[in-house]
């Protein structure tokens, strides 16, 4: 599978396979022998910004497809966490299933784009976060499943060892750093999140 679809062909494929998800977001689906991709497509007035964002998204999705093989199927899906006039926040879920395994494995990847430039913004753009901050917040009731369900302190199975690059912003302007399954809690808790909104930089959001 090619890593990047040329811009014109990419647009034509999307026109045939996309379905609306939000005012400026479309959902595209691709399937192959060993993969299924469900990913967002950004629509905007500036073609360069649109291409920058969509190329980054598709590159991520295509890596998942390229990992698929006989007896190992892969998938890629997403959730739109927030969109406003300036920012676009997604959670991506690349995963794979080995034939015969008890369950598949997947990761949580959080990305925030600047809609005025197309640039993917680091966590440090919105908040200054340290490992000590994450441990403190996790232990003081700011630990959740990514969907907002609180995780009790007694269910914690690990402590943050580093500040992840992955994060998202929700519709309320809250900032969450995310961790893939098993890192901080059991597999059933899925992708977990620590609310770092209190560390946010004033006036950025």
Q: What is each residue range found by the language model?
A:
Residues 7-8, 100:
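Composition-driven detection of intrinsically disordered, low-complexity segments
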Residues 19-205:
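Compositionally biased intrinsically disordered regions enriched in Thr/Gly
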Residues 1-4:
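Positively charged n-region of N-terminal signal peptides that target proteins for export
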Residues 8-15:
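Bacterial N-terminal signal peptides
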């Amino acid at each position: 599978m090619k890593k990047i679809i040329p811009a014109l062909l990419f647009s034509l494929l999307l026109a045939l396979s996309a379905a609306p998800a939000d005012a400026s977001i479309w959902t595209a689906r691709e399937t192959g022998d060993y993969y299924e991709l469900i990913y967002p497509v950004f629509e905007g007035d500036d073609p360069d910004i649109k291409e920058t964002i969509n190329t980054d998204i598709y590159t991520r999705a295509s890596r998942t497809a390229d990992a698929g093989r006989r007896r190992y199927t892969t998938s890629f899906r997403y959730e739109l966490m927030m969109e406003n006039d300036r920012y676009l926040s997604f959670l991506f879920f690349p995963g794979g299933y080995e034939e015969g395994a008890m369950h598949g494995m997947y990761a949580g990847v959080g990305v925030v784009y600047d809609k005025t430039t197309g640039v993917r913004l680091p966590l440090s753009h919105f908040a200054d976060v340290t490992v000590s901050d994450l441990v403190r917040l996790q232990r003081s009731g700011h630990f959740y499943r990514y969907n907002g369900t609180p995780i009790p302190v007694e269910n914690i199975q690990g402590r943050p060892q580093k500040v992840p690059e992955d994060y998202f912003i929700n519709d309320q302007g809250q900032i969450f750093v995310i961790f893939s399954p098993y890192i901080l809690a059991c597999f059933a808790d899925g992708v977990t999140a620590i609310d770092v909104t209190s560390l946010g930089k004033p006036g950025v959001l």
